[in-house]
From Swiss-Prot:
Gene that this polypeptide is encoded by: rsgA
Region (Required for binding to mature and immature 30S ribosomes): 287-319
Chief localisation class: cytoplasm
UniProt name for this protein: Small ribosomal subunit biogenesis GTPase RsgA
Chain's role: One of at least 4 proteins (Era, RbfA, RimM and RsgA/YjeQ) that assist in the late maturation steps of the functional core of the 30S ribosomal subunit. Binds the 30S subunit contacting the head, platform, and rRNA helix 44, which may assist the last maturation stages. Removes RbfA from mature, but not immature 30S ribosomes in a GTP-dependent manner; 95% removal in the presence of GTP, 90% removal in GMP-PNP and 65% removal in the presence of GDP. Circulary permuted GTPase that catalyzes rapid hydrolysis of GTP with a slow catalytic turnover.
């Protein structure tokens, strides 16, 4: 994946924030090694400021401080940590995270002040949760898929609330989902209310670390509750009977274990992936069905719109590429341009 470009104003803010954090870290006292036991392996199940909850190999969770030399630590990181010893006055000292293992993957999102910010590590797959209520939006699904392709993390599309569909509605939704099945994406139809379709989803989650992405109101948290066998541990984003709007809730990112095997990181930071930091070429690459036609256009600088000799547009006209995907591709590019214009205007004020 090519390196994302930041504007001069954004880069100044990133550098300023980094220097501020360095200054703060130098002012913090170091930790006495005599306060801690032998090094052990663990996984970060949650991060709270300068502390992290680390789960050891035996399943116990330990609240730990973080060495100031560690620049980045997020939920899902595999770490070397040391338990705290009982202090003289009988109070246990917090453990300490000593080092972070190399990540197999990292889930990031653009941040206006800190550049591209990591929010979870060592993710195997992203579960894109959509629903027929409050709205089945293929545009939002396509935005998530572009993010997954750019991050090089495997996606699974899960359509929730199928219990609200009659036969005609189910046929229509299946036709819409065939657009994604036909280009190689896995689609699962489920209901967190009736638990229909949960078994295939459980099988897809077993043995992997997943993260669920979905806008408020699609039943993401209710689905997680059903999979985890919980009732209230994860707050729900239910649909209001009167308004049809999702009731917004947030919690800190945390790793949970599925009873059937596998793990999930629940984070409010993946409700929507921002794409404004990407280049147009990265968006194009994020549409997998475009790949066979890239480089075949008449002009090298083809915008894949009304340009003469555009191989991608011709494939759309021939029915080889879904028209809805092509339209959403241009909607994403247009929304990116609008956001970048606003942010560049803001940068001129710095």
């Amino acid at each position: 994946m090519s390196k994302n470009k930041l504007s001069k104003g954004q880069q100044r803010r990133v550098n300023a924030n980094h220097q501020r954090r360095l200054k703060t870290s130098k002012e913090k006292p170091d930790y006495d090694d005599n306060l801690f036991g032998e090094p052990d392996e663990g996984i970060v199940i949650s991060r709270f400021g300068m502390h992290a909850d680390v789960e050891s190999a035996d399943g116990d969770v330990h609240r730990c401080n973080i060495r100031r030399t560690i620049r980045s630590l997020v939920t899902g990181d595999r770490v070397v940590w040391r338990p705290g010893k009982p202090a003289a006055e009988g109070v246990n000292v917090k453990g300490i995270v000593e080092a972070v293992h190399e990540r197999t993957s990292v889930l990031t999102r653009p941040d206006f002040y800190d550049g591209v910010k990591p929010i979870a590590a060592n993710i195997d797959q992203i579960v894109i949760v959509s629903a027929i209520l409050p709205e089945l939006s293929l545009n939002i699904i396509d935005r998530y898929l572009v993010a997954c392709e750019t991050l090089q993390i495997e996606p699974i599309i899960v359509l929730n609330k199928i219990d609200l569909l009659d036969d005609e509605g189910m046929a229509f939704v299946n036709e819409q989902m065939d657009i994604y099945r036909n280009i190689g994406y896995r689609v699962l139809m489920v209901s967190s209310h009736t638990q229909d379709g949960l078994k295939p989803l459980e099988e897809a989650l077993t043995g992997r670390i997943s993260i669920f992405a979905g806008q408020s109101g699609v039943g993401k948290s209710s689905l997680l509750n059903a999979l985890l066998g919980l009732q209230k541990e994860i707050l729900t984003n239910d649909i209001s009977d009167n308004s049809g709007l999702g009731q917004h809730t947030t919690t800190a990112a945390r790793l949970y274990h599925f009873p059937h095997g596998g793990d999930v990181i629940d984070s409010p930071g993946v409700r929507e992936f921002g794409l404004w930091h990407l280049e147009p070429e990265q968006i194009t690459q994020g549409f997998v069905e475009f790949h066979d036609y890239l480089g075949l256009c008449k002009y090298r600088d083809c915008k894949h719109d009304t340009d003469p000799g555009c191989a991608i547009r011709e494939a759309v006209e021939e029915g080889k590429i879904a028209e809805t995907r092509f339209e959403n591709y241009h909607r994403i590019l247009e929304s990116m341009a609008q956001v970048k214009t606003r942010k560049n205007f803001s940068d001129t004020d710095d």
